[in-house]
Design a protein with these regions (language model features):
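Intrinsically disordered, low-complexity serine/threonine- and proline-rich regulatory segments
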Residues: 1-10, 91
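Short, solvent-exposed loop/turn elements at beta->coil junctions and helix N-caps
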Residues: 4, 67-69
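N-terminal helix-turn-helix DNA-binding core of bacterial DNA-binding proteins
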Residues: 6-48
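Basic amphipathic alpha-helical segments that dock to polyanions
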Residues: 49-56
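Glycine-centered, phosphate/nucleic-acid-interacting loop/turn motifs that mediate DNA/RNA or nucleotide
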Residues: 60
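Short beta-strand "wing" residues that participate in macromolecule-binding interfaces
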Residues: 64
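Basic, amphipathic "hinge/linker" alpha-helix immediately C-terminal to the N-terminal HTH DNA-binding motif
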Residues: 70-92
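Amphipathic alpha-helical dimerization/coiled-coil segments
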Residues: 86-118
Length: 118
């Protein structure tokens, strides 16, 4: 169970940082973009996203800026930092190594996986 939770957390962080690497977004926009880009295979709830963003902010991986929207409403925009970009590259490398290791074991034991990308 712990492995699954840690894996989900790492993958979610990787995907959020990857999206932010392409530009600044506010929380709800991140949720929508993740679901759209994954074609509905990944969805994240606000109760998961915001604690993750706060953790990333605390670790200097993400910064934020509050902007006034309309006359009274404030929206918080999130942006990946240089530390966040470096961390994203580390996560991507670890994820790539893990996927390669899984594929190696599956192929060695007569199974295979088929990954389709656009």
């Amino acid at each position: 169970m712990t492995l699954k939770i840690n894996l989900q957390k790492s993958v979610a962080e990787m995907l959020v940082l990857s999206i932010l690497n392409n530009g600044t977004m506010y929380g709800y926009q991140l949720i929508q973009e993740l679901e759209a880009q994954s074609k509905g295979l990944f969805s994240i709830k606000e109760g998961t996203l915001y604690p993750m963003l706060y953790r990333l902010i605390d670790n200097n991986m993400v910064s934020f800026e509050k902007k006034l929207v309309g006359k009274r409403r404030t929206r918080v925009y999130y942006n990946i930092t240089e530390d966040g970009k470096e961390y994203l590259q580390q996560i991507l490398k670890s994820y790539q190594d893990m996927v390669q290791g899984v594929a190696n074991v599956l192929v060695k034991n007569g199974q295979s996986i088929h990954i389709v990308t656009e």
